[in-house]
A protein has these predicted regions:
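Conserved signature/switch motifs of ABC ATPase nucleotide-binding domains
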Residues: 99, 163, 180-181, 460, ...
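Charged, flexible cofactor/metal-binding loops and thiol motifs
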Residues: 77-83, 249-307, 320-325, 546-623
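A short, proline-enriched helix->beta-strand linker immediately N-terminal to the Walker B motif
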Residues: 180-184, 477-481, 497
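Conserved ABC ATPase signature
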Residues: 160-165, 169, 458-462, 466
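Conserved ABC ATPase "signature" region
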Residues: 137-156, 381-382, 436-453
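ABC ATPase "signature
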Residues: 243-247, 255, 540-544
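ABC ATPase C-loop
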Residues: 173, 178-179, 470, 476
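ABC ATPase NBD Q-loop/coupling interface
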Residues: 69-96, 134, 205, 374-396, ...
Length: 624
């Protein structure tokens, strides 16, 4: 008889609250076979992460296991399966399992790693706690595991702090910490949600490789069906604390039965959606958008050309090599970026983390001063240099160009009510009376599909999707022409993401807004954008209408980005072998005529109407 590594039966988890007990997980049952990957799928709040916490017995104090069993059959010994649900959460038995035989990769590596200790100390500590080794042996093992998970300089990683690492390297450090003890079960809770698409593909490939080497079982918690299609052997779908469908990956993707799973699949943005086709969220948001522009906004003159244009923007940052050395090095974050945003259209700006996307948006907002280049804004009276604006003109520009932030949890002041959040921009710009502002706040809530009775609530009482709608409402308060959207849906699960994307489209159609939409998710950008600019290492490397770009990508970096997107179609798997060999983000490794070396910017050249690609200067001269 083949006993599963982990067998959960009739698990219930209860939370205490002021109004009584709440059952977050109800009668959950599933198995994790030895050496296999099981994906636990569902929206935020479905009980996925709480289940993982119960397996490790790290539930919050207000929660308890209300019933059921969690049987763990450790292949390292001949003992009968151990029921984790009956163990003392503070006892020696669970402490030996936790981080030793059962390890976990958490969703946000920056908050999971201590900022006060080097990653070398944190990774080696796991082995010191669970293995009979000396400090020197633990550090040697840490170097080995850093090399295995892809650190470019494993020895230097020993003395590196988390804040010195990119998001991808932080997640690799978390994987190293989990794997150094060679666990039998690895629980990965949304391990790639915060990562860009190429880094995500690398992390997924790394997890597959390491799982095969160690014959480890993987419990993958995610809401990304593209990741599930490329990683899972078995899938368990949760909704409101219960399993609604479970089975082999191929059965669920080809023959989904439950309406919830079918709805989850319809909410995922897909490439080549038909013009005008909408995402189908699990729960529709009814908003009252039409006829909400004021008379003053309707009377504004419209620009004849681009509403916003950037030309040859450059920005560099000087970093110190150490506190006392005095040595510095210059980082070129943005190199000759030129963009044009048409009225009522969406320009998608895509690329990996650190490529300069957010720096460009900050310069457009005048939060950063460029080293060179210009940004012009046309409010209907002709283009004006944004960096020359002062006084009332600058205030008018800030009113016309608003920002929607990435993180809906940290971008709203927790000490302000919804009414105060929505009316603060009106108060700062001295718009309307107190009664006018109150009416405007109610209108804004209705526009984003929230009840006007929420005005006296605080941000903590809202879900992530509701908070992001509040962020959009705040950005709309001053009736802007342009919204700069910096990864506005990356922190949201797929069904809430569909609500926000549909809302942004509806607002644009009704209010004539222009969007600069910054994202690393190409499927999302394909859904919402009209034109797409691809950015790498501070350069715009390709720009085209979205249909052209996805049908005929020319630049090798664009091709690599598209190849790294996990598709929720099991007939279109990721080519992990090709992704591993590509040096797609290094301009010096690009083939001719795209290669950029020695600080060369190259030049954008048009290869068909509206389709531009960056090539070397020599190639451009030959073409001329």
């Amino acid at each position: 008889m083949n006993v599963p590594l982990l067998s959960i039966r009739d698990l219930s988890i209860d939370f205490k609250s002021d109004v009584g007990a709440f059952r977050a997980v109800d009668g959950l049952s599933f198995d994790v076979p030895k050496g296999k990957t099981v994906a636990l799928v569902g929206e935020s709040g479905s009980g996925k992460s709480v289940t993982a916490q119960a397996i490790l017995r790290i539930l919050p104090k207000v929660a308890r296991i209300g019933g059921g069993s969690i049987l763990f059959d450790d292949p390292a010994n001949d003992e009968p399966p151990l029921d984790i649900a009956t163990l003392d959460p503070e006892g020696e038995t669970i402490r030996a399992l936790r981080g030793g035989r059962i390890a976990m990769i958490f969703q946000e590596p920056m908050t999971s790693l201590s900022p006060l200790h080097t990653v070398g100390d944190q990774v080696s500590e796991a082995l010191l706690l669970h293995g009979d080794v000396s400090k020197a042996e633990a550090l040697d093992s840490a170097v080995d595991v850093f090399a295995r998970v892809g650190f470019p300089d494993p020895k230097r990683a020993l003395v590196t702090y988390p804040f010195e690492l990119s998001g991808g390297l932080r997640q690799r450090a978390m994987i190293a910490m989990a794997l150094i003890t060679r666990p039998a079960l690895l629980i990965a809770d949304e391990p790639t949600t915060a990562l860009d698409v190429t880094t995500q593909a690398q992390i997924l490939d790394l997890m597959r490789e390491l799982q095969g080497e160690a014959q480890m079982s993987l419990l993958l918690i995610t809401h990304d069906l593209g990741v599930v299609a490329n990683m899972a052997d078995h899938v368990v779908v949760m909704y409101r604390g219960r399993v609604v469908e479970a089975g082999p990956r191929e059965d669920l993707f080809r023959r989904a039965q439950h309406p919830y799973l079918k709805a989850l699949m319809r909410a995922v943005p897909r490439f080549a959606m038909a013009p005008g086709e909408r995402l189908t969220p699990i729960r529709e948001v009814k908003s009252a958008i039409l006829a909400r522009r004021t008379e003053a906004a309707q009377a504004r003159p419209e620009p004849k050309g681009p509403v916003l244009a950037a030309a040859d923007l450059c920005k560099s940052f000087t970093l110190r090599a150490g506190w006392f050395s005095g040595r510095t090095r210059k980082i070129h974050a943005v190199n000759g970026v030129s963009l044009q945003l048409a009225r009522g259209k969406t320009l998608g700006l895509v690329g990996e983390s650190g490529c300069g996307k957010t720096t460009v948006s900050k310069m457009i907002m005048r939060a950063l001063q460029p080293d060179s280049g210009t940004v012009t804004f046309d409010d209907g009276a002709g283009p004006r240099d944004v960096f020359a604006l002062e006084g009332d003109d600058l205030k008018a520009y800030r009113r016309a160009v608003q920002f929607v932030f990435q993180d809906p949890f940290s971008s709203l002041n927790p000490r302000m009510t919804v009414y105060e959040i929505l009316t603060e921009p009106l108060r700062i710009h001295e718009i309307g009376t107190s009664d006018d502002r109150f009416e405007r706040a109610k209108q804004l809530l209705e526009m984003v599909g929230l009840d006007r009775r929420y005005l006296r609530r605080y941000p903590h009482s809202f879900s992530g999707g509701q908070r992001q709608r509040l962020g959009i409402a705040r950005a709309l308060a001053l009736e802007p022409r342009v919204l700069l959207c910096d990864e506005p849906v990356s922190a949201l699960d797929v069904s809430v993401q569909a609500q926000i994307l549909n809302l942004l489209k509806d607002l644009q159609s009704a209010l004539g807004l222009s969007y600069l939409f910054v994202s690393h998710n190409l499927a999302v950008v394909d859904y919402i954008a009209d034109t797409i600019a691809v950015m790498c290492r501070g350069y715009i490397v390709e720009e085209a209408p979205k249909v052209t770009l996805f049908r005929n990508p020319v630049h090798p970096y664009t091709q690599a980005l598209l190849a790294a997107v996990p598709d929720p179609d099991i007939d279109r798997p990721l080519d992990f072998a090709k992704l591993k060999t590509d040096r797609f983000s290094d301009p010096a490794q690009w083939p001719e005529p795209f290669r950029l070396v020695g600080g060369e910017f190259g030049a954008m050249t048009e290869i068909e109407s509206g389709h531009r690609v960056r090539v070397t200067r020599a190639t451009e001269r030959e073409a001329a």
